[in-house]
Amino acid sequence: MTLAKNQKSSLSRLYKKVSSKRSESSRNLEDESRTSSNSSGSSSLNVNELRTVFDYMDANSDGKISGEELQSCVSLLGGALSSREVEEVVKTSDVDGDGFIDFEEFLKLMEGEDGSDEERRKELKEAFGMYVMEGEEFITAASLRRTLSRLGESCTVDACKVMIRGFDQNDDGVLSFDEFVLMMR
């Protein structure tokens, strides 16, 4: 696994972990603000969630993530970054050259503006391929059930149809790669 991939996946896991630990009251406040806001509401909700993750990582609350703070958070997730790797992560993410990752730099990193969009798309293509039956170009309820079964999850075809329906934008009963990408966001 490359350093960029390791960095991105560790930060993504941290993002999910911290986001899932938000209190119910925070969720209710966000739901209310999302309901009352315009179309940019979903975007600002994402920024709010990223702010929560950033604040969690910024242990000393100085508005910046240091190499030590980054290393500590990755360690909490069961990952490991050497001092050299941490230095490289900070160096590649640190646009203003102050030796830290500020919130704007963190946003760019998490939104894929660090040049890793192609890598992310390639990873998603590989994951998509796991769910697709040979010779097909989409995920069907049967192929989803088969893959989930191989992963130890039992699920009926009808339940898989319901899962697919949630992300099937053109109502054709299957998931295309683009629909899969939306689902994985």
Curated annotation (Swiss-Prot):
Ca(2+) 1 binds at residues 58, 60, 62, 64, 69. Ca(2+) 3 binds at residues 168, 170, 172, 179. Residues 35-44 have a biased composition (Low complexity). One of its GO terms (cellular component) is cytoplasm. One of its GO terms (biological process) is cellular response to hypoxia. Ca(2+) 2 binds at residues 94, 96, 98, 105. Residues 1-12 have a biased composition (Polar residues). Residues 1-45 are annotated as: Disordered. Pfam families: EF-hand_7 (PF13499), EF-hand_8 (PF13833). The keyword Repeat applies. Gene3D superfamilies: EF-hand. Residues 45-80, 81-116, 119-154, 155-185 form the EF-hand domain. Keywords: Calcium, Metal-binding, Repeat. InterPro entries: Centrin_CML-like, EF-hand-dom_pair, EF_Hand_1_Ca_BS, EF_hand_dom. Residues 21-34 have a biased composition (Basic and acidic residues). Induction: By touch, salt and hydrogen peroxide treatments, drought stress, wounding, dark and infection by the bacterial pathogen P.syringae. Expressed in cotyledons, stipule, young leaves and at the hypocotyl-root junction. In mature root, expressed in the stele, cortex, emerging lateral root, root tip and root cap. In mature plant, expressed at the base of cauline and floral branches, and in rosette and cauline leaves. Expressed from stage 9 to 14 of flower development in anthers. At stage 15, expressed in carpel, sepals, petals and pollen until dehiscence. Expressed in developing seeds and young siliques. GO terms for molecular function: calcium ion binding. Potential calcium sensor that binds calcium in vitro. Binds to ABCG36. This is Calcium-binding protein CML37. The gene is CML37.
